[in-house]
Regions:
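Domain-terminus/edge residues, biased toward the C-terminal soluble/receptor-binding domains
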Residues: 76-80, 88-195
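Active-site-adjacent loops and short helices of periplasmic peptidoglycan-processing enzymes
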Residues: 1-97, 106-110
């Protein structure tokens, strides 16, 4: 998690052309894998996803192949990934059932669970941000004390494209039991309230 990663300049033009959500890292900035994981999970930083994919697998294509292999291992029979960001591609498809399966498996990993349930994270000083900067969860930072009947929302990951609509994978605790809820295709846009 402490491995340094430099964000390559060539990933930014395509992400900006697609109006992708960015965490705030800059081309040539060096941050840790941990910082980029928080950047991917909290503010949906596409630049973090791209940089991590290249760091882990050498290329976006090789990483996507690993994503599809893991999906098959998990029995996600209606899922096919085309990129590490979740940005629209007509062949990049899944279902809420498959996303719930992935969320359940991922939550078994202690590091992922911490990322999924964190409201804010401060990136320490980097070569481009000498004061560091703070990122907030696109879900938890907007809930502001909202509670469920006899429960609470523990964490979640939002997503949005014009084609997919508003999407959400969330973890809640109700009466001492944990529940995963995945929704997709909701109306609105990336600035619509998450509830």
């Amino acid at each position: 998690l402490d491995t340094p990663v430099t964000l390559p300049e060539e990933i930014f033009p395509a992400l900006q052309a697609q109006n992708a959500s960015l965490a705030g890292f800059q081309a040539g900035e060096t941050a840790t894998v941990r910082d980029l994981l928080y950047g991917a999970m909290l503010p949906s930083g596409a630049e973090c996803c791209e940089a991590l994919a290249r760091e882990v697998s050498g290329s976006e294509e090789a990483f996507v192949a690993r994503m599809n292999q893991k999906a098959a291992e998990l029995g996600m029979t209606a899922t096919h990934f085309c990129n590490p960001t979740g940005l629209h591609d007509p062949e990049h498809v899944s279902t809420v059932r498959d996303m719930a399966r992935l969320t359940e498996a991922a939550l078994q990993n202690e590091t992922f669970r911490k990322l999924f349930t964190t409201e804010r994270y401060t990136v320490p000083a980097t070569n481009c941000h000498p004061q560091g900067f703070t990122m907030h969860s696109t879900l938890l930072s907007q809930l502001d004390g909202t509670e469920l009947h006899s429960g609470r929302i523990l964490g979640g990951k939002t997503g949005y494209t014009g084609e997919a609509g508003l999407c959400l994978a969330s973890l809640a605790e109700v009466k001492g039991r944990e529940y995963i809820l995945v929704t997709a295709g909701a109306g609105g846009n990336h600035s619509t309230a998450p509830y």
